[in-house]
Amino acid sequence: MNITTALPLPTHLLSEKVTAPLLGARKIYITGSRQDIRVPMREIALTPSSARYGGNENLSLALYDTSGIYTDPQATIDLACGLPRLRAAWIDERADTVEAALYFKVPESVSVTAPPFPTAPRPRRARDNVAVTQLEYARRGLVTPEMEFVAIREQQRREQTVENLRGQRHAGDAWGALVGTPITPEFVRDEIARGRAILPNNINHPESEPMIIGRNFLTKINANIGTSALSSSIAEEVEKLVWAIRWGADTIMDLSTGRDIHATREWILRNSPVPVGTVPIYQALEKVGGHVEALSWAVFRDTLIEQAEQGVDYVTVHAGVLRDFIPLTASRLTGIVSRGGSIMARWCQAHRSENFLYTHFEELCEIMRAYDVAFSLGDGLRPGCIADANDAAQFAELEILGELTHIAWNHQVQVMVEGPGHVPMHLIKANMDKQLAACGEAPFYTLGPLTTDIAPGYDHITSAIGAAMIGWYGTAMLCYVTPKEHLGLPNLQDVHDGIIAYKIAAHAADLAKGHPAAQARDDALSKARFEFRWQDQFHLSLDPEKALALHDESLPKEAHKRAAFCSMCGPQFCSMKISQEVRDASSNELSDGNTNTNDAI
């Protein structure tokens, strides 16, 4: 192995912009039944209402937090050491894994332009004939520390939050999901055992904080990062990781296709508190020089084991792109738009053979269960434009993904299923309905969908519309789209804009489903707005810094943050100020009426 550059990731590259606590937030930890279960949350302390509004205390709000230790001022951050190995003791206690001989080593002949991670741990794998998946544990009736961690995280101090809701909580329509059920460790276990949720935690990624993906839980979002052959570096991608989780990415997919894929992934995994997904076919193709015809099952198998040893938590596998389905795409306007799907279609044609990922699927399962890597069954034939939505090719593949889901479950492997794509609004619900029927309620994970094709540069908006809808119908995780979609590799600002758009979509979906704690944040912000508690409004926002900046563009003085108006209406035309005056007058009239009545008596 020939290393040609110095360490690219000094700690100082993570600026305060990336690591400082979010405005108005405090990192807190809630301890579970054992001292090493410490669940992070972001607490927003609220100011009291003024005397005019009752003078009451406003209780703090605990919010779901994905940022890891990076926003904890007490934490020491050193990218070269990686994050604390949060789950290492839990994995050891189960005594069902062994230290494995390193399966993959970078060949001496390969020129590496970035150094390996300096303290990479030895990989572990399952003991012979043992499955070490959360699905296996759940089916055995075992509630793991990971499951308890998830239950506390999803519950979000729900009892306190719901009790303090000021307004009426809307019931919502969950389309058959169980969103009102209290989230207990036993509920988490049962959902995983039924295959309706996954807890993606590779035994070789002990740094990850357990989270869950399923339609009976909070709607999650994924952010894609990764180097390309033309731009970006390991340093930039690690910074994108930290930036993405700061704003709320629940998982990360490393879609690197350039040089140093192995090293890039190692740096990301060792510094990621959220699950990391990949598409192994990209690296497999790099190994054969980019020649699709040279791909083989053996190359893919070795690549999958390499990534499992590093700690990848879930992998996209395009095993549903069958040879017989390829002609169904011939009449499409944009053909096959999935990179992985197009690679496998080309391989099938070149070899006049069936997709090796399909024919070797049970062998894939045996690898996955030895590390607890979850399947993200790829929709290689997803529609790439509105014209191709809901066509025969898309739904033929979906039926195969349903078959593969049940095969994976038989091997105790966790599964979620990927979905489109580009779909007009009136066709979105059919996608959710067909997936639930074909895939036995396995979690659905969709890219958008984009609801129109006319807005390059704004596809984070066109897709967030579809994401909110399909999230309401039951999609468990939404893959973000950035403004750079179809145009280029996203930078930090693009990542931020994509995540905020998708946090809005996910939260809107949770509100529509009637998630018990979802409305609490809306009510708290609305109350702060009506009472002109400007700082609380900023702090409760998805993007506090932007809310503050936009307010201060026209009213920058500190006194303006106590004013009962904004620059939109000014002091004379503020509807909320006038509404309060109406309320005060009505209260006085009622009081006067009561007094007069008493006097008459």
Curated annotation (Swiss-Prot):
GO terms for biological process: thiamine biosynthetic process; thiamine diphosphate biosynthetic process. It catalyses: 5-amino-1-(5-phospho-beta-D-ribosyl)imidazole + S-adenosyl-L-methionine = 4-amino-2-methyl-5-(phosphooxymethyl)pyrimidine + CO + 5'-deoxyadenosine + formate + L-methionine + 3 H(+). [4Fe-4S] cluster binds at residues 566, 569, 574. Its EC number is 4.1.99.17. It holds the Pfam family ThiC-associated. Keywords: 4Fe-4S, Iron, Iron-sulfur, Lyase, Metal-binding, S-adenosyl-L-methionine, Thiamine biosynthesis, Zinc. The keyword Ubl conjugation does not apply. Zn(2+) binds at residues 422, 486. Binds 1 [4Fe-4S] cluster per subunit. The cluster is coordinated with 3 cysteines and an exchangeable S-adenosyl-L-methionine. It comes from the Bacteria. GO terms for cellular component: cytosol. InterPro entries: ThiC, ThiC-associated_dom, ThiC/Bza_core_dom, ThiC/BzaA/B. One of its GO terms (molecular function) is zinc ion binding. Substrate binds at residues 224, 253, 282, 318, 338-340, 379-382, 418, 445. Its cofactor is [4Fe-4S] cluster. Pathway: Cofactor biosynthesis; thiamine diphosphate biosynthesis. Catalyzes the synthesis of the hydroxymethylpyrimidine phosphate (HMP-P) moiety of thiamine from aminoimidazole ribotide (AIR) in a radical S-adenosyl-L-methionine (SAM)-dependent reaction. Homodimer. This is Phosphomethylpyrimidine synthase. It comes from Xylella fastidiosa (strain 9a5c).
